[in-house]
Swiss-Prot record:
Organism field: Campylobacter curvus (strain 525.92)
Entry EC no(s): 5.1.1.1
Record-stated family: Belongs to the alanine racemase family.
Matching InterPro entries: Ala_racemase (IPR000821), Ala_racemase/Decarboxylase_C (IPR009006), Ala_racemase_C (IPR011079), Ala_racemase_N (IPR001608), Ala_racemase_pyridoxalP-BS (IPR020622), PLP-binding_barrel (IPR029066)
Matching NCBIfam families: PRK00053.2-2
GO molecular function: alanine racemase activity; pyridoxal phosphate binding
Protein name listed in UniProt: Alanine racemase
GO cellular component, one term: cytosol
Lineage of the species this protein comes from: Bacteria, Pseudomonadati, Campylobacterota, Epsilonproteobacteria, Campylobacterales
Modified-residue entries (N6-(pyridoxal phosphate)lysine), positions: 33
Length: 337
């Protein structure tokens, strides 16, 4: 049976590095959406809670319910307001309609569109937003934005940061006008945390960095947490001239000992079609086309590490490490080691 092994020492190291850069554990909100980026939300939530993280963000209410006992506060990022919100959670408001559809008295964070144009209220909508917030008894606990290019060397980050600074000032003015408590503000994602040393927000909101993947530079000295392992199903000698797998994509030029391992694209891996060389963690190449539930390679023993750095697969498939990690099937066993 294939399995995902999570290095707990590496995870705690990453949390320590992030907390130190942010100015304390209390200033860190961990993003655990999509099964904690494929790592396993329940395991990661337990470890983060044990470390002392009190606040996390997830995609949906169903995700929040899975890890509710681990955190004091959970922000739901992608909820579509329906009037049936849970008072134990905090909900992101992604447009003006959400303010009128969400259950009265709900705890909310306003999303501010500072130039990404994906979700959020425009600056010009802020004053109008405070009407329904006040009238419907919504608890405005926070406001945030998302940087579209904090990992790129251009002016986008600085434009958005200035726009958010102006939005924060306007929100504070409106809080005074409507006699409401001041909310917390957050904007820095993993790349922004790595890139900049000064923060004028209350919290940072970190996703991929907790799992050991730097998005801008390696200043935090992060360590990958996840390694993917497959167990041997069978073994054989592939004779010179014989081919393995669908389409006979790999043919041996000499006798080699090969094995089939129990992991394939049905487990959430991008499908290797046998073109070029896709190295496993031991440096040996996958041989032939990947099957739905298995792949072949030179015999590496009872277990083989498929990867311990998602960047290797991301480079081969011309994608990003998020894409490799988040697709890993929730059916694969996960454990801390």
């Amino acid at each position: 049976m294939s399995e995902i092994r999570l290095n707990k020492k590496a995870y705690i190291h990453n949390l320590m590095q992030i907390s130190n850069k942010a100015g304390g554990k209390e200033r860190v909100m961990l993003v655990l959406k999509d099964n904690a980026y494929g790592h396993g939300a329940k395991l990661i939530a337990a470890a983060a809670s044990e470390f002392g993280i009190k606040f996390c963000a997830v995609k949906s209410q169903s995700e929040a319910l899975e890890i509710q006992r681990n955190f004091e506060k959970i922000l739901i990022l992608s909820h579509i307001a329906n009037g049936d919100e849970d008072q134990n959670f905090i909900y992101a408001i992604n447009d003006m309609k959400g303010l009128n559809r969400i259950k009265r008295g709900t705890r909310i964070h306003l999303v501010i569109d500072t130039n990404m144009h994906r979700n959020g209220l425009k600056f010009s909508e802020l004053e109008a937003a405070f009407g329904p917030i006040k009238e419907r008894g919504l608890a405005l606990e926070g406001a945030y934005t998302h940087f579209r290019a904090s990992d790129e060397m251009n002016a986008d980050y600085f434009v958005q940061r200035q726009n958010f600074k102006e939005a924060k000032a306007e929100i504070l003015r409106l809080c005074e006008k409507f006699a409401m408590p001041h909310p917390i503000f957050h904007s820095h994602n993993s790349a922004a945390l790595e890139r900049f040393g000064e923060f004028d927000d209350d919290m940072v909101r970190v996703g991929i960095a907790q799992h050991g993947y730097a998005q801008f530079d390696d200043s935090l000295n992060l360590k990958p947490v996840l390694s993917l392992w497959a167990q041997k199903v069978s073994e054989r000698v592939l004779k010179a001239g014989q081919c393995v797998g669908y389409g006979a994509k790999f043919c041996a030029d000499k006798d080699i000992n090969i094995a089939t391992y129990d992991l394939g694209y049905g487990d959430g891996l991008l499908r290797y079609a046998g073109d070029g060389e896709l190295p496993l963690a031991n440096g040996k190449a996958m041989l032939g086309k990947m099957s739905m539930d298995s792949f072949s390679c030179e015999d590496a023993g009872e277990w083989v590490c498929v990867f311990d750095d998602a960047n290797v697969w991301a480079r081969y498939f011309d994608t990003i490490n998020y894409d490799i990690l988040v697709k890993l099937s929730p059916n694969i066993k996960r454990k801390f080691v």
